[in-house]
């Protein structure tokens, strides 16, 4: 298990293809925290840039509906992102544990995320990767928070959108048509609500609206269907 100075690692919460997440105690204040690190021992410049980006954007947002970042620690050739631990699990995991949620509870979740997105957009931030894995819910309080601002964008004051993207960013199954880079249109706050719509569809039906193992076919579905 990873060792980080000043923190006592308690358990591993997540082991993904790109990141590892741990629950820990900050030793000085005896405060519970969550720590996210990169899987790659020698991350690329772009991976490091995205890691710094999620800290830089989130730390300047005074919004209760996002996971608060505490610090970005140096860790060998990489970083460790230290965040608040509010006792949440991913919405993806929560739905697997509760496959018969009432419509009222589902609507409560979606309304909370909608309010968080509204606050984000009031702060000129577009998340660009809304999906069940990036929405945390506390099983006891039902409070919802957003995580992972690694590809989020802060809009300049003079603009309401990001120019037509040259590279594809986001998760294919939840990607807005504008994020495909094939629409000759900029990206604005509606991209996040498009992804939230797909997320709500998945919560209601238990499946995604577009199902394909072919990336190009999925892109076409988002654009044309």
Where do the protein language model's features map onto the residues?
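Protein kinase catalytic-loop region centered on the HRD/HxD motif
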Residues: 115-125
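Conserved short submotifs of the Hanks-type protein kinase catalytic core
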Residues: 76-90, 94
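Activation segment signature within eukaryotic-like protein kinase domains
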Residues: 109-110
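Structural helix C-cap motif within protein kinase domains
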Residues: 205-208
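A short, aromatic-enriched beta-strand patch in the conserved N-lobe beta-sheet
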Residues: 71-72
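AlphaC helix of the eukaryotic protein kinase fold
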Residues: 42-60
């Amino acid at each position: 298990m990873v060792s980080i100075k000043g923190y006592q690692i308690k358990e591993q919460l997540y082991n993904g293809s790109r990141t590892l997440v741990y629950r820990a105690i900050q030793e000085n204040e005896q405060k519970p925290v969550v720590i996210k690190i990169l899987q790659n021992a020698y991350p690329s410049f772009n991976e490091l840039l995205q890691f710094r980006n999620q800290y830089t954007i989130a730390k300047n947002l005074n919004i209760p509906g996002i996971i608060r970042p505490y610090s970005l620690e140096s860790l060998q050739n990489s970083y460790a992102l230290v965040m608040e631990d509010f006792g949440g699990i991913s919405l993806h995991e929560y739905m697997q544990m509760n496959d018969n949620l009432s419509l009222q509870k589902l609507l409560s979740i979606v309304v909370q995320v909608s309010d968080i997105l509204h606050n984000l957009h009031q702060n000129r931030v577009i998340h660009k990767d809304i999906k069940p894995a990036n929405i945390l819910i506390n099983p006891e309080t039902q409070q919802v928070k957003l995580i992972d601002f690694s590809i989020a964008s802060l809009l300049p004051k003079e603009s309401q959108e990001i120019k037509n993207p040259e590279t594809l960013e986001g998760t294919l199954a939840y990607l807005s048509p504008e994020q495909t880079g094939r629409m000759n249109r900029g990206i604005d706050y509606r991209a996040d609500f498009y992804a939230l719509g797909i997320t709500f569809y998945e919560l209601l039906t238990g499946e995604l609206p577009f199902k394909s193992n072919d990336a190009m076919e999925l892109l076409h579905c988002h654009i044309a269907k």
